[in-house]
């Protein structure tokens, strides 16, 4: 098993302290690129640690960073830049990326985190290498023209038992460069219901971006 280096810490973003967990390849192994993992309202960076996603990504050669979003997890004291369900400024996630020095990256965005990732995705200056939405909210708040301009390779993931996954897909399918992974028998946090299928699909997608 490949050696993996684990760490955690905080970054300052617009005067707010945000907690993060990180896993990267050990033994001085070169990093392919960075993957930023966001989370839903009932979850946190700990979800990705416990599921093994951080470890699996680092084993495969990626720098994996999971943050606790403002007001949640160990970032509970941080004020969110927008009310839940409203689009946050794209510059907020850009500031997170800068503070973590992630460079060209892939963003994994389940559920609640759509309010942060979608504005970042459609920003003209976006440096996203790849986008992995998992039944995110706010997909109806992006217009068709903005979706059509996005060239970022996208893996749309959702469980077939999740109505939000189906409804968000109706908007996300407007992204020109997308593929779809539907997990049979899985609900809203489909990655928890089908972790092996999640990790296989994610790693296959990332491999093609290298």
Swiss-Prot record:
Catalysis: reaction(s): L-lysyl-[protein] + acetyl-CoA = N(6)-acetyl-L-lysyl-[protein] + CoA + H(+)
Family: Belongs to the AB hydrolase superfamily. ABHD14 family.
Entry GO terms, CC: cytoplasm; cytosol; nucleolus; nucleoplasm; nucleus
Coiled coil: none
Key words of the record: Acyltransferase, Cytoplasm, Nucleus, Phosphoprotein, Transferase
Protein name: Putative protein-lysine deacylase ABHD14B
Gene Ontology terms: biological process: positive regulation of transcription by RNA polymerase II
Principal EC category: transferase
Role summary: Acts as an atypical protein-lysine deacetylase in vitro. Catalyzes the deacetylation of lysine residues using CoA as substrate, generating acetyl-CoA and the free amine of protein-lysine residues. Additional experiments are however required to confirm the protein-lysine deacetylase activity in vivo. Has hydrolase activity towards various surrogate p-nitrophenyl (pNp) substrates, such as pNp-butyrate, pNp-acetate and pNp-octanoate in vitro, with a strong preference for pNp-acetate. May activate transcription.
Record text on subunit structure and interactions: May interact with TAF1.
Organism annotation: Rattus norvegicus (Rat)
Compartments, as annotated in UniProt: Cytoplasm; Nucleus
Gene3D superfamilies in UniProt: alpha/beta hydrolase
Disulfide pattern: none
Residues the record marks as active site: 111, 162, 188
Modified residues (Phosphoserine): 91
EC number(s) per entry: 2.3.1.-
Transmembrane helix recorded as keyword: no
GO MF annotation, one: protein-lysine-acetyltransferase activity
Pfam family, one: Abhydrolase_6
Origin superkingdom: Eukaryota
SUPFAM superfamilies: alpha/beta-Hydrolases
């Amino acid at each position: 098993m490949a050696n993996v280096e684990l760490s955690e810490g905080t970054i300052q973003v617009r005067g707010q302290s945000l907690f993060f967990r990180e896993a990267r390849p050990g033994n001085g192994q070169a990093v392919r690129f960075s993957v930023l993992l966001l989370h839903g309202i009932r979850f946190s960076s700990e979800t990705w640690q416990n599921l093994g996603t951080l470890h699996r990504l680092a084993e495969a050669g990626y720098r994996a960073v999971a943050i606790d979003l403002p007001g949640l997890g160990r970032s509970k004291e941080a004020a969110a830049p927008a009310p839940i369900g409203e689009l946050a400024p794209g510059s907020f996630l850009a500031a997170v990326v800068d503070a973590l020095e992630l460079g060209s990256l892939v963003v994994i965005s389940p559920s609640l985190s759509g309010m942060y990732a979608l504005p970042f995705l459609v920003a003209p200056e976006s440096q996203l290498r790849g986008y992995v939405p998992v039944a995110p909210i706010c997909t109806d708040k992006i217009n068709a023209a903005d979706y059509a301009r996005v060239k970022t390779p996208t893996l749309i993931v959702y469980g077939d038992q999740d109505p939000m996954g189906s409804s968000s897909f109706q908007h996300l399918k407007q992204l020109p460069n997308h593929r779809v992974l539907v997990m049979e028998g899985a609900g809203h946090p489909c990655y928890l219901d089908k972790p092996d299928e999640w990790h296989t699909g994610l790693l296959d997608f990332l491999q093609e971006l290298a």
